[in-house]
């Protein structure tokens, strides 16, 4: 585990928990931060797929992942409306439902770190000799799902 990433992860987790608890929503929250092995595997996989990460161009955006799981589809939309109050959304990918196929709808959002989180990230980076830090973005992935899509 990379301690600085865990500190950032825990802060994001708590911030989301505090905001969602204010509205009395029923949900579950999961989080993880990538360890060195996982980061290196992802870098290798993307390179073998012909889509390598590049410094200052194509960066890993999910060193931290947060998943909010709600009981109802409408609650996913509610969470998506509420969280921009406390998080900075950068990009999103939302599945378009097919009327003839039963499948979960994925909502994945890339969020920017706060200034304080960037400071922690940069402190970890400055004390590390690992070159992969140049391939890491100061963002995290937020996934919104329903219980049904969790299987």
Mark where each language-model region is:
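Nucleic-acid processing machinery
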Residues: 1-151
